[in-house]
Amino acid sequence: MAQQLAREQGITLRGSAEIVAEFFSFGINSILYQRGIYPSETFTRVQKYGLTLLTTTDPELIKYLNNVVEQLKEWLYKCSVQKLVVVISNIESGEVLERWQFDIECDKTAKEEGVRREKSQKAIQDEIRSVIRQITATVTFLPLLEVSCSFDLLIYTDKDLVVPEKWEESGPQFITNCEEVRLRSFTTTIHKVNSMVAYKTPVND
């Protein structure tokens, strides 16, 4: 029985990819809600990681995010994705106002068949909960977005990766005159995700 429990708690590369992709699904939803990119009434409450989180009910956005997360899961499994960035821009001017960057490290030795890492789901979820809580708390220091904004998702992958047709190449979309705040990280022992947010420094009149 003890051996079986240890096996169940072991993290595989596939399992790790699913955990990290799921985090991005909830994390992106949290950012879009907290920053008011979509109307608050288009979100619904769900329980995850011991928290009450908000996820979109917008059909087009659900379809888009599901496609991104499924593709991301495959790239995480191949250890070929380096970072995911949520870019928030002024719709009218195109100016980048915020850049949420998640750097992804992958232990490629986990690609070997049968490799499992010892870390409990609970320990991983506790770390993810801390990251999500920080995302929620950023509204206390991020400048108010007083203009209509849109968002883009950038995914940095290995150069030799075959990218689906619907995906476009993009520049890094950096911010001029910005402040950066490093957020917490979490690790499955196979994938490690480091988080930070950069935002345009408000100009004092």
Swiss-Prot record:
Region (Required for assuming the closed conformation and for interaction with CDC20): 195-205
Main location: nucleus
CC terms in the record's Gene Ontology section: chromosome; chromosome, centromeric region; cytoplasm; cytosol; kinetochore; mitotic checkpoint complex; mitotic spindle; mitotic spindle assembly checkpoint MAD1-MAD2 complex
PTM field: Phosphorylated on multiple serine residues. The level of phosphorylation varies during the cell cycle and is highest during mitosis. Phosphorylation abolishes interaction with MAD1L1 and reduces interaction with CDC20. Phosphorylated by NEK2.
PROSITE patterns: HORMA (PS50815)
Swiss-Prot/TrEMBL keywords: Acetylation, Cell cycle, Cell division, Centromere, Chromosome, Cytoplasm, Cytoskeleton, Kinetochore, Mitosis, Nucleus, Phosphoprotein
Record Pfam families: HORMA
Residues that bear Phosphoserine: S130, S170, S185, S195
Family, similarity comment: Belongs to the MAD2 family.
Function: Component of the spindle-assembly checkpoint that prevents the onset of anaphase until all chromosomes are properly aligned at the metaphase plate. In the closed conformation (C-MAD2) forms a heterotetrameric complex with MAD1L1 at unattached kinetochores during prometaphase, and recruits an open conformation of MAD2L1 (O-MAD2) which then promotes the conversion of O-MAD2 to C-MAD2.
Assembly behavior: Monomer and homodimer. Heterodimerizes with MAD2L1 in order to form a tetrameric MAD1L1-MAD2L1 core complex. In the closed and open conformation, interacts with MAD1L1. Formation of a heterotetrameric core complex containing two molecules each of MAD1L1 and of MAD2L1 promotes binding of another molecule of MAD2L1 to each MAD2L1, resulting in a heterohexamer. Interacts with MAD2L1BP. Interacts with ADAM17/TACE. Interacts with CDC20. Dimeric MAD2L1 in the closed conformation interacts with CDC20. Monomeric MAD2L1 in the open conformation does not interact with CDC20.
Free-text comment on this protein's domains from its UniProt entry: The protein has two highly different native conformations, an inactive open conformation that cannot bind CDC20 and that predominates in cytosolic monomers, and an active closed conformation. The protein in the closed conformation preferentially dimerizes with another molecule in the open conformation, but can also form a dimer with a molecule in the closed conformation.
Name of the protein: Mitotic spindle assembly checkpoint protein MAD2A
Organism: Mus musculus (Mouse)
